[in-house]
A protein has these predicted regions:
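Histidine-centered catalytic micro-motifs
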Residues: 261
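Positively charged n-region of N-terminal signal peptides that target proteins for export
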Residues: 1-5
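Active-site His/acidic residue clusters
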Residues: 264-286, 332
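Active-site pocket-shaping loop/turn-to-helix segments
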Residues: 285-293
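Non-catalytic accessory regions flanking glycosidase/transglycosidase catalytic cores in CAZymes
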Residues: 20-258, 292-517
Length: 517
């Protein structure tokens, strides 16, 4: 009888283990505070503002005569919210728009500026009220640096060279005199300058070899004072295409400081059926996360090629367009790319940050698309009202990682599986912050189950732990103008430190950022 009971107990236990989801199993790992890695450049948390839909006008710019409270035409609420994020850099004016933008259309008295046509995004008139001076005034207001994207597609080396002289020269020339007449006698400091955008597509449909010659031609004439030269960024590849990295890094020459890279996360398998921003099920939840995790593969593939020609990692790999892209909302202009922003987008943002951190030795700037009212936005506006998205809150939670030092992590994580899709259930990164604390970012991709986690801390002693959590009940939980605080961070008290070990149960579909002191 005793043997029968033991046998039955074993069968029941085996059946229980077999039926358990992967996330019923604990995760264990190590934070290597004893092996500090690369600096996580604050520019990994950059923004992108294109003349597209309501991204600039109504989003950032309302004009000085607007009833919406503003300073010099910039929305007070948006400026204040962006300052809270410690935005390091903003990319402008595009995007595809950059290769049809002629900078002279956006300087001088606003009433005298020409109205042009935005052929890329909805075929709508472009007032040019927001131009060079307005952009540089704006980034100064929010405490950010400037990343300007030059026009290769419909421009010329002379046009680009004159724009850079207008921006940076301190010599008495006709261009600097014009700048002074337009209200800015002193030159600006431009941190980054790109020679074209998506030259494989909307920027000219070029081959890497053809664009290489174009880049070197333009770079020859982009002359600035030695101490005012921006980082020159070449238009690089996208998705799994590594040919651009191979061609540009092997032959780009001394003027090449970085190459760009673009990758968007879509739930579907092709651009004609990307998937919905809201009202989706768990199948689109996991497919979205599986697709966003490909960012790691793409960075690794490009970095391996760059390492062949640039082992000292002098050339940066800048992901200056990334984020989610869904089908347009019914009833809205498709070319305006307005979409809602949910808890899923917050998880996507956190996953990408953890990926970028691991490649901080090569990835030194990224720019999410886009800042306000476009794609995976930080902020949505409607008339005088403003709402902060779940993605905004993730950027805010990750502020301690800006200019922190990467601490390598090891994690034995279970997998989250649904049908044919399977992804790691947990994502983690850690860093030593400027204040000496250890920041730990954790993401639970499983929308149904919490996961117990234990992380040993090697090479450091911490006595206290505090944190924040972002989660919600629904997969597509979102903030609206009627309910602006439906998804927002809350204090997290579920982590315990004991004997150099950090233990917690990471709630389902959550982002948690901890500070260990």
């Amino acid at each position: 009888m005793r043997l029968i009971v033991i046998a039955c107990t074993f069968v029941i236990l085996l059946a229980t283990l077999t039926s358990m989801s992967a996330t019923d199993l604990p995760s264990a790992g190590v934070i290597h505070a004893d092996q500090p890695g690369a600096k996580i450049d604050r520019h990994l948390y950059g923004q992108f503002a294109e003349h597209l839909g309501r991204g600039i006008e109504e989003g950032v710019w309302v004009g000085e005569d607007s009833r919406i409270p503003n300073v010099r035409g910039f929305r007070n609420d948006v400026v204040a919210a962006l300052r809270e994020l410690h935005v390091p850099v903003v990319r402008w004016p595009g995007g595809c728009f950059a290769d049809e933008y002629h900078w002279r259309d956006g300087i001088g008295p606003r009433g005298s500026r020409p109205t042009t046509l935005n052929t890329n995004w909805g075929g709508v008139p472009e007032s040019n009220a927001f131009g060079t001076h307005e952009f540089l005034d704006f980034v100064q207001l929010i405490g950010a640096e400037a990343y300007i994207n030059g026009n290769v597609g419909t421009g010329s080396p002379r046009e680009m060279a004159e724009w850079l002289q207008y921006l940076t020269s301190d010599k008495p020339t006709a261009l600097t005199a014009e700048r002074a007449r337009n209200g800015h006698p002193e030159p600006w400091k431009i941190a980054y300058f790109a020679v074209g955008n998506e030259t494989w597509g909307c920027g000219g449909n070029m081959s890497p070899e053809h664009y290489l010659d174009v880049f070197r031609q333009y770079a020859t004439f982009l002359k600035t004072p030695v101490d005012a030269r921006p980082q020159l960024i070449a238009s690089g590849g996208h998705d799994e295409d590594t040919s651009w990295a191979d061609t540009l890094v092997s032959k780009g020459g001394r003027d090449l400081n970085a190459i760009s890279f673009h990758y968007y996360t879509i739930p579907g398998n092709h651009w004609r059926n990307k998937g919905s921003a809201i009202g989706f099920g768990e199948d689109q939840w996991i497919s979205t996360l599986a697709h966003t995790l490909k960012m790691d593969d793409f960075i690794r593939a490009n970095a391996a090629i760059m390492d062949k020609y640039d082992p000292q990692k002098k050339v940066a790999f800048d992901v200056d367009e990334w984020g989610t892209w869904y089908d347009p909302e019914t009833g809205r202009e498709p070319g305006f790319l307005y979409q809602q922003n949910t808890l899923r987008d917050a998880v996507v943002a956190a996953l990408n940050f953890n990926i970028f951190h691991q490649h901080a030795d090569r990835v030194r700037m990224t720019n999410i698309a886009q800042m306000v009212n476009v794609l995976q936005a930080m902020i949505l506006t409607k008339g005088p009202r403003m709402v902060l998205t779940p993605t905004y809150h993730v950027f805010h939670m990750f502020r301690p990682f800006q200019d922190a030092t990467l601490l390598p992590t090891e994690l034995q994580a279970p997998r989250y599986t649904l049908g044919s899709e399977s992804v790691p259930a947990i994502s983690v990164s850690a860093a030593r912050t400027a204040t000496g604390a250890i920041a730990v970012a954790l993401v639970n991709l499983d929308p149904r189950k919490a996961t117990p986690i234990t992380l040993s801390i090697a090479g450091a002693k911490a006595r206290t732990v505090t944190g924040e959590i972002l989660t919600a009940t629904a997969l597509d939980a979102r903030n609206t103008f009627e309910s602006p605080d439906a998804v927002k961070p809350a204090p997290f008290s579920g982590a315990v430190l004991k004997d150099s070990k950090l233990s917690l149960s990471l709630p389902a579909k959550s982002v948690v950022v901890l500070s260990l002191q």
